[in-house]
Amino acid sequence: MASTSSGGRGEDGRPPQMQPVRSMSRKMTRAGTMMIEHPNEDERPIDSELVPSSLASIAPILRVANDIDQDNARVAYLCRFHAFEKAHRMDPTSSGRGVRQFKTYLLHKLEEEEEITEHMLAKSDPREIQLYYQTFYENNIQDGEGKKTPEEMAKLYQIATVLYDVLKTVVPQARIDDKTLRYAKEVERKKEQYEHYNILPLYALGAKTAVMELPEIKAAILAVCNVDNLPRPRFHSASANLDEVDRERGRSFNDILEWLALVFGFQRGNVANQREHLILLLANIDVRKRDLENYVEIKPSTVRKLMEKYFKNYNSWCKYLRCDSYLRFPAGCDKQQLSLLYIGLYLLIWGEASNVRFMPECLCYIFHNMANEVHGILFGNVYPVTGDTYEAGAPDEEAFLRNVITPIYQVLRKEVRRNKNGKASHSKWRNYDDLNEYFWDKRCFRLKWPMNFKADFFIHTDEISQVPNQRHDQVSHGKRKPKTNFVEARTFWNLYRSFDRMWMFLVLSLQTMIIVAWHPSGSILAIFTEDVFRNVLTIFITSAFLNLLQATLDLVLSFGAWKSLKFSQIMRYITKFLMAAMWAIMLPITYSKSVQNPTGLIKFFSSWVGSWLHRSLYDYAIALYVLPNILAAVFFLLPPLRRIMERSNMRIVTLIMWWAQPKLYIGRGMHEEMFALFKYTFFWVMLLLSKLAFSYYVEILPLVNPTKLIWDMHVVNYEWHEFFPNATHNIGVIIAIWGPIVLVYFMDTQIWYAIFSTLFGGIYGAFSHLGEIRTLGMLRSRFKVVPSAFCSKLTPLPLGHAKRKHLDETVDEKDIARFSQMWNKFIHTMRDEDLISDRERDLLLVPSSSGDVTVVQWPPFLLASKIPIALDMAKDFKGKEDVDLFKKIKSEYYMHYAVVEAYETVRDIIYGLLQDESDKRIVREICYEVDISIQQHRFLSEFRMTGMPLLSDKLEKFLKILLSDYEEDDYKSQIINVLQDIIEIITQDVMVNGHEILERAHLQSGDIESDKKEQRFEKIDLSLTQNISWREKVVRLLLLLTVKESAINIPQSLEARRRMTFFANSLFMNMPDAPRVRDMLSFSVLTPYYKEDVLYSEEELNKENEDGITILFYLQRIYPEEWSNYCERVNDLKRNLSEKDKAEQLRQWVSYRGQTLSRTVRGMMYYRVALELQCFQEYTEENATNGGYLPSESNEDDRKAFSDRARALADLKFTYVVSCQVYGNQKKSSESRDRSCYNNILQLMLKYPSLRVAYIDEREETVNGKSQKVFYSVLLKGCDKLDEEIYRIKLPGPPTEIGEGKPENQNHAIIFTRGEALQTIDMNQDNYFEECFKMRNVLQEFDEGRRGKRNPTILGLREHIFTGSVSSLAWFMSNQETSFVTIGQRVLANPLRVRFHYGHPDIFDRIFHITRGGISKASKIINLSEDIFAGYNSTLRGGYVTHHEYIQAGKGRDVGMNQISFFEAKVANGNGEQTLSRDVYRLGRRFDFYRMLSFYFTTVGFYFSSMITVLTVYVFLYGRLYLVLSGLEKNILQSASVHESNALEQALAAQSVFQLGFLMVLPMVMEIGLEKGFRTALGDFIIMQLQLASVFFTFQLGTKAHYFGRTILHGGSKYRATGRGFVVFHAKFAENYRLYSRSHFVKGLELVILLVVYQVYGTSYRSSSTYMYITFSMWFLVTSWLFAPFIFNPSGFEWQKTVDDWTDWKRWMGNRGGIGIVLDKSWESWWDIEQEHLKHTNLRGRVLEILLALRFLLYQYGIVYHLNIARRHTTFLVYGLSWAILLSVLLVLKMVSMGRRKFGTDFQVMFRILKALLFLGFLSVMTVLFVVCGLTISDLFASILAFLPTGWAILLIGQALRSVFKGLGFWDSVKELGRAYEYIMGLVIFTPIAVLSWFPFVSEFQTRLLFNQAFSRGLQISMILAGKKDKETPSTKYLGHTEESFGLEHDTNTFNHYYLWT
């Protein structure tokens, strides 16, 4: 090795630069070792997996070294040394991240191995490696050809390739022998055929996998590999500097995608990925309903159908832009080949487009030009397609990425940097939509092709001069470009702009009702009187002004996009504005002439117009004005006509539609068919009639008379300084009264929507058969038709069989056979999940073979106790006739089956055991006697029923012996003895003439000895006892005889019951027929994952919190049945699990009960298991195997053949991709959590071989001598204990930098999905095995011809929330979420037709969406709620969204108060951003009126209504504040006529329904009633109220209102991680204060002051019950907002915790802020961050903040005039003096503060003198005020109420004008004022908590309140709260223990609280 060592370690022996490494080897080795240390030696990372990203190419070498280490350690050493040399050449200075540590670690390892490794085959390294290479080739590759799988061969070829590379560095070229060279050339020639593959090993030789033998795959490959007549590309001499591989690119191509790659320069990984994608698509579509005989080629219709799907959007785009489509097919061309070329080209563009995939029309533009190039290459030559014509090809495989995608990506990156991490206004930068909509205009063709990078799209005016020292991968911000088509302006006016028709309807209806109510009669019929009707016509004037407002908003808010608009669009905006202005002038003028006896302004207009105007001119004007609305109504009634006109691109139609709506590429033709239109119109007509009637009779009419009285009153005695004392009509009073009423009027439609949606949803759910099977009793009663229903719905009938239309109770044996396979697998799965025990499993199983039993063998849980009951019935039967007894038995359906089965099974078991023919004859004769006596109706006379119980007992003993241990010595004798006893009982005790049978047997056998009887039944066949199916029969019979309890209690687990009943119930619901697996749609599942938990570690399971509670211990108490089942499973001796296996099983058991990735993956992989089982079943039926039952164990060849075919079809139909965005970083990380996530994900890949993991790989590569980061999308699979790379596709840059994280994570991985459908699953979801059977039914919903309707593009599925059983909060959230994903979405889909995509597990039409922007939108901030935008986009582009409830998936939710609040805040933020978005604007404007109403009230309108609800309380209380402080309440409202009217309170009572959360509860009650029964629903409702559900919902109302309003006003939306923990933990007071201070506490305290002031100074309505209810509801709101976080905080009222929280809060308040001080450490840091939104808001936002702050000045203004010291003076001087006092107080406080800073440390005496002087001055002033001026104690308290709000107003204004106050030097004073207020608020909130904490029972009550639901589930919270776990108990480390080994030490002195993990 000497020569190799010296020659291999550098050109000059040991290079100098390696000396530091060697000298630091010990130190660096320690660092490296630390990097790879792992507590479990078996899980220690392998060195090949620790390679730094800049050295990624050496990882395969190290993997090979590890693979051959056991075989030849010396050669493995040489491989590692070669890797080290290569690493040193790649990075000689070790500048890359982690390179130095890795090289040091590797060098240290080499030094160790050099001493211990020995030569095995030769004496020198060159000879050793050559001999090993030859041996390896001969033993593995040569012998493995045709025998090993492609996957195994791929690995062998990879090893051989690396070995030869190493060999060349060890052996000089001249010394490599011929055999080695020959083998190496053979490897080089074939290695590409054996690359690692995803699903299809396309070019692999040797043993074919089953999937490659499928005829559809062969046909698809044949079509894709048709390269006849394609010209061969060549490369220009300019590419001479390319490496050898690239120069070889032009030599050959195997398929059309390779040809496209050579022409355009697509990456090899992209080509391989899309090749498989296209083949699978073709195969899956083509095989559908096709005869497999003579199946050799793809049908032309298949390619045509695929073309139509992929290019529907492209063709629409071409028509819209009026340009010719380049999908051209010249005469004489191979149309199929050309079609596949076009499809392949689109797929390759899409596969490499990265972030540009979010821009579908940009992709259309790219494809448009490249398709033109393809056509030019193929048909543009003079001598076309002769095979020898060469065309210029792309220079390298990254040409397309570099020249097309990267420039567009850089534009995106440049724009997103203007976003400033969400702080910049949306109008300041262009998002994905803006850049994509650039291609909606014909001006996009100015980009030309190849794209001109100097075009306006790429270059900004100030980018000519580059920024100095700018890195090459950076982009300058440049000058802002205009928005495209729309500007996302941050204003509430967006709500009016988007939904103007709704607001106009509500305003005009309100005006109409007020006019009608103003009539003296008050009757609604008054509208038909002439004067009222004439007045009602004024609504058109209002309408004109509202239209003017709409036109103005359109003009102003779209101004930022004007530069991108066409002239016709700008003219439309201007014309609309001018027309609206004209009508706003004309209608009032014409109306003025029509008024009789005009006065005032109307008289002026009337005289000005002149006498030539006729009185009816106004009527003509109205007719002309409403003409467009009449046309709109016609279009509404004829949706097909509207749809045709909107989609038309004819110029005349475009001109006609120009006025109605702006021409836009999307949002055309979204109108529904007539029946759907009728349904949602009926819904809304009924709702609006109810709403308007209620508003008229309850809200408006009762207020009219008091308003008239107030209008006529004149008040002179004001109690404050009135600025307008001579004003008439008391406008202020009227506004104060009508303000809340108007707000309630605009909001209460939301209440009516909740009521009507609940009613319609309940009715529709009932008609959908929901909840027909709710309990196990119901399941048991209907189980006899379940097999028929199962086969009718979930199994395809063979060809030629008609589908049964009606289910009946006749049972077909083949139905039972089909059903039993699936049912038993379902039951076994639940056992594997520990939901049921072994015994419960046996009771639930259906026999897997029919045997010789003549009746249906039902599961034992249906037959439980039937045999004992029948025996008792027979024993006690007093009648004489057999018929009566048998009639009694048959009256119980299952009892008859049980009796017959038991009899026949006993007969078969005994008969099968006997070997002696005479013994068998006795048994036959006994059975004959039984049968003939039954037929002849003499059974009771021939048999004694009294002996039956004794026989049953003996049979039970007999069966138990048969199932006992076969190895026991007396096993046979025991069986013989009991068998003889049984025969004796039958013949002697049961049969009347039984002795005759024995005597005949004796005579027939010729034996007359009397003792022969004792020798009978001794010859038995014990081999049967080892037969599995025979033992199953014995077990089943034993269960029939022994199970006594009622089957209603089986299974015990509530979850198992729920799953069984839902599955059975779903079989009776409407669903499409199941196709054969081969005919079903193929689909993928995609799960985005970031850094969440994958699998809990052993340390996490056993880590105790401060109360000694572990996750494991906690879960044992929550799931006691499942824990018991788990212990039974792992302790089963048959499994023989090692301690290590038990530890792994324990980790999985815990992880499968949390919200972990492992749970999600397990659930999704059930799809594959179900598909394989369904395939298996179909194959067995096709081959008529075993009467429809599964093949027996003996038929192993059939089973293997069927299994291989089933797996192949499952590969074809299902793919699961988990997008682990940072998997690569986790793999290289040294942090234990990241390493754990990496290892756990790897183990998932190894456990589930078909699981695929996609991740973004970040590498350091040297480009032009400089290191830079390069990003790749990579797809992995598990292979031989490691991950194996399948595809690697280079990206133009970091994809997640452009948009929101989750959609970008999905987008990079979507290219690796397959199939026609795509299901999106979050990592906190679960799936259930039995639900997977229905997947092929669900996918049939996409079949466009199924119901004659347009096919859906998104299928919505229901969810089951599995986190509701822990605490009351979890239960509330679970119920709320469940009602939303069931009844809520049911109504949205039908009848309202406005369901979108609300998260997962929805199923997308994959091809539709990947050609239209993907399955989500990703623009920063605006698409924060990325999932719903997928639904918006789908609907706008002509999609159709449905909802289906016969299938469900599981979903977890956050269960802690703070986590729930984070979630609600995130959703409210998202809705705020939606309000600003173009999608909501376009949907709101382009839906018809009623569908628009549905859209509004189910999306942003719900949150706006929440905000109005809160605003109503404010308006009401501030209105009352105005009335009581001004004295108007006493003067006006106390008059008898006004006092009698309490309409305002009645209206507010309706509002409080929303406020208290009853709207949330209504759908919950209906859904629970439907699915569990209305008694249960009523009970749950009562329990929820007792557990303070209304407090929770009222609190969340405040969360919604705050974050929705703040988002629209100021922005600041961000993704809020909410956690996936098990349950809640105690949150400190400071944490709660930080989280809820601004959203709830400030608002709550403001309402407290309002209520106190009104209580002190107001006097009206005190006796009214409605007033009391309103007051109560407001105090309830206040209490909820102030104290809900503490009520729902575990241990929130425990004294010690309260003391600790106060200490922590004081410390936090006192800490100073500064750079680097986090917000949870210092109040100053938090206070600064709380104002972050004001730093970045615009001028409008600041002005609004100041205006809102001015309301706090009203308190001081009103209260000072009510002070006794004011002596009823109402001059303005009083108010001025109050300000002087306030400023004096603030000045004194400032002096104290400054004195403390100046004198506090060095001049203590001076500071004390200052304080003394101030104190004396204060006493003097107070004395004078009390004695001289008449100040009272009540005045002091009133002054506090007056001045506190004023100080808060000053503080808010100071924050809004921060820069101004800083400039004036007052900012420190503002900060100190803020700190003082925080202290006051904290003290006010904390005091009640501290008082309640004094009483221990409060804490106990709170615990019961929080965890009552868990108590009802058996959760022993009392044990957890009472004491810690017994430390002496054997640890829960491994689960070789039973449940009893986990005890609790009862200690009443331990802390009475508990923390659990999040």
Swiss-Prot record:
The entry's keywords: Cell membrane, Cell shape, Cell wall biogenesis/degradation, Glycosyltransferase, Membrane, Transferase, Transmembrane, Transmembrane helix
The residue ranges for the Extracellular side of the membrane come to 526-535, 591-620, 695-730, 1518-1547, 1598-1640, 1689-1742, 1793-1812, 1857-1878
Taxonomically, which superkingdom?
Eukaryota
Q: Where is it mostly found?
A: membrane
Catalyzed reaction equations: [(1->3)-beta-D-glucosyl](n) + UDP-alpha-D-glucose = [(1->3)-beta-D-glucosyl](n+1) + UDP + H(+)
Segments spanning the bilayer are 505-525, 536-556, 570-590, 621-641, 674-694, 731-751, 1497-1517, 1548-1568, 1577-1597, 1641-1661, 1668-1688, 1743-1763, 1772-1792, 1813-1833, 1836-1856, 1879-1899
Q: Which Gene3D superfamilies match?
A: Vacuolar protein sorting-associated protein vta1
Disordered: where is this region? Answer: 1-29
UniProt keyword tRNA processing present = no
GO terms for biological process? Answer: (1->3)-beta-D-glucan biosynthetic process; callose deposition in phloem sieve plate; cell wall organization; phloem transport; regulation of cell shape
GO cellular component terms, alphabetically, are:
1,3-beta-D-glucan synthase complex; plasma membrane
Q: Give GO terms: molecular function aspect only.
A: 1,3-beta-D-glucan synthase activity
Q: Where in the cell is it found?
A: Cell membrane
PANTHER family this protein is in? Answer: CALLOSE SYNTHASE 7 (PTHR12741:SF16), LYST-INTERACTING PROTEIN LIP5 DOPAMINE RESPONSIVE PROTEIN DRG-1 (PTHR12741)
Name-wise, this protein is Callose synthase 7
Organism of provenance: Arabidopsis thaliana
What does the record give as the organism's lineage?
Answer: Eukaryota, Viridiplantae, Streptophyta, Embryophyta, Tracheophyta
UniProt gene name: CALS7
